Design a protein with these regions (language model features):
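Glycine- and aromatic-enriched membrane alpha-helices
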Residues: 2-462
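Positively charged, small/polar-rich N-terminal and surface patches that mediate targeting and assembly
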Residues: 416-422, 435-587
Length: 587
């Protein structure tokens, strides 16, 4: 008996530690949301996105301490709400610290989902207000129904880790906010009757940053779904289903977009990974590999459909796909419990023992019992979120205003809301990006001065341009991969100086069709090399012929050669002008 007690104690302590580690992983997901939202939006708003994700958690912590936690896990009042209280201040010695931290990080996740759908045009103050309301009232009350012993929990509604009470609620808040807020300037083109006739794509400025965010979220999701597990078998099963669903969703999305758009869509596949994670969250403990596989397939298709629906039918601007990922797949994940719950999953017996589920899913012989409960929970929680967030957003719009001004949106919220010239100042040229340099009058070089130490002494020579030595500038736009061949060809004919620049551009053909999140872009800017050469000795036609010889493939995009007359040239170091300025030093 003593051995069994020791074993149980060790198990309890181990899973208690894992519970807090899981909470830390969920907190780390805030970084993932920040990276996804930043990468999928434009650079001029990157700092604003980061600031909003930071304040989600910080404001959420304050209001959750004061209001939210007791409403969520306080003494149940009629199955609807927890009894308000301040035990964290008045009874700290007996306070459930672990439960508070765990529920806090879940609460912050709900609020941060809204940020992406309303990105690039929301006033920062307004964002802080509605984020606080979500964390203080909207999330804690509906989460009490499910996790705090409320009426849905008493009925046997099952949402193990939050497909419904976190992701669906966050997604519903996002779509309501985005609808009331309106689209970004230029997203939808309307005719004189106000009908949308065209949808424009606004590509995010950093797909790698978005991908980093997805991997951070996926990693954190093992804590998100697994932290509440109390046996090693249950934990292992949750990890397995949490891996299968997003992987299958991503492959499904890749195949579908490959067929539909002729190329696999990177950003859509990143969204599909998150969609699979959202969809499996409610049933991760009570479904098996087969169920997770099917849930993932539907999630991968649903996210593509959701993005298309918002863009082309509802005309709601969602820059990061938050609605398709969280709302639609939150609904799907909630319903999926009633379809795929099985007693073969280790967590099913635990859920049944705790009254957290009533029956197996429809496809496993349980009939419509659990499916009916899941539908009831989805409808009531959705209705709560719709009513609350509609009131909140309309109230904000009528008072302090919800949307940034047109000028602020065009300039970018970084500079207008935060005084931040650029979130990437180190990569910019100009005042914002260059290091400070101390300049004294001793460093100034005067023309004609005999005391100049900075310049190499040289005789100033001037000459008339020979009649047969006209100065010409040749500019070549070409494919990057042909540059080394061009450089060798120019060297072979005696051209020894050139200026090379990496550029983006396209010709009249606008490049091949390109899609971003299912929307065809106006034109595709392709990476090119721009080579500039100023020549006098070498005949222009020799340069043109040599360039054409190495650049020609017979396909669109071989490049173009531009020829300009040059009026004069001045060599800064020596003061030489004209033809002489282009010549090297005499031996």
């Amino acid at each position: 008996m003593a051995v069994e007690q020791i074993t149980n104690l060790i198990s309890e302590q181990t899973f208690g530690i894992w519970f807090l580690i899981g909470a830390a992983l969920v907190f780390w997901m805030q970084a993932g949301f920040a990276m996804v939202e930043t990468g999928f939006t434009r650079a001029k708003n990157a700092g604003n996105i980061i600031m909003k994700n930071l304040m989600d958690f910080c404001i959420g912590t304050v209001v959750f301490i004061v209001i939210g936690f007791s409403l969520l896990l306080g003494e149940d009042l009629a199955g609807f709400i927890g009894k308000p209280g301040f035990d964290i201040f008045t009874a700290y010695e007996s306070f459930d610290f672990s439960s508070f931290v765990f529920n806090l990080v879940f609460c912050a996740t709900t609020a941060t989902i809204v940020s992406g759908a309303m990105a690039e045009r929301t006033k920062f103050l307004s964002y802080c207000v509605y984020s606080g309301v979500i964390s203080a009232l909207v999330y804690p009350i509906e989460a009490h129904w499910i996790w705090g012993g409320g009426w849905l929990a008493q009925l046997g509604f099952h949402d193990f880790a939050g497909s419904c009470c976190i992701h669906m609620v966050g997604g519903i808040s996002a779509i309501i906010g985005a609808k009331i807020l309106g689209p970004r300037i230029g997203k939808f083109v309307k005719d004189e009757k106000g009908k949308v006739v065209k949808v424009n794509a606004f590509p995010g400025h950093s797909i790698p940053l978005g991908a980093l965010g997805v991997f951070i979220l996926w990693f954190g999701w093992y804590g998100f779904n697994g932290a509440a597990c109390t046996t090693i078998e249950d934990l292992g099963s949750v990890f397995l289903t949490t891996t299968i669903a997003p992987a299958v969703a991503t492959v499904t999305c890749m195949i579908f977009t490959w067929i539909k758009y002729k190329k696999p869509d990177v950003s859509m596949c990143l969204n599909a990974s998150l969609a699979g994670l959202v969809a499996i969250t409610a049933s991760c403990d009570v479904t098996d590999a087969k169920g997770a596989f099917v849930i993932g397939i539907v999630a991968g298709l649903l996210v593509v459909f959701g993005v298309w629906l918002l863009d082309y039918k509802l005309h709601i601007d969602d820059p990061v796909g938050a609605v398709a990922v969280h709302m639609m797949n939150g609904i799907w994940g909630t319903i999926a419990v009633g379809l795929f719950a099985t007693s073969k999953a280790p967590g099913y017996a635990i859920a049944m023992e705790n009254g957290a589920i009533k029956a197996e899913g429809l496809f496993f012989g349980g009939g419509f019992t659990q499916l009916g409960l899941q539908l009831l929970g989805f409808v009531t929680v959705a209705a709560w979120a719709v009513v609350c967030m509609t009131i909140v957003f309309l109230a904000i719009k009528a008072t302090i205003g919800l949307r940034a001004s047109k000028e602020e949106e065009i300039k970018g919220l970084d500079i207008c809301e935060h005084g931040l010239t650029s979130a990437y100042a180190g990569f910019e040229f100009g005042a914002a990006g260059m290091p400070d340099i101390d300049i004294t009058y001793d460093d100034v070089v005067s023309v004609g001065s005999e005391s100049v130490e900075n310049a190499v002494p040289a005789m100033v020579k001037t000459s008339e341009i020979p009649d047969d030595k006209k100065i010409t500038k040749v500019e070549i736009l070409m494919k990057q991969e042909r540059f080394e061949a061009l450089k060798k060809a120019m060297n072979d004919i005696g051209v020894t100086g050139m200026t090379v620049t990496q550029v983006l551009g396209c010709g009249a053909q606008k490049g091949a069709p390109e899609y971003y999140r299912g929307v065809q872009m106006e034109m595709q800017l392709l990476p090119k090399v721009q080579v500039e050469m100023v020549i006098s000795k070498v005949p222009v036609m020799d340069v043109i012929n040599a360039a054409r010889k190495v650049l020609y493939t017979g396909h669109i995009g071989d490049g173009k050669i531009f020829v300009y007359d040059v009026e004069n040239v001045v060599k800064v170091r020596t003061g030489e002008v004209g033809y002489d300025a282009l010549q090297g030093e005499d031996d």
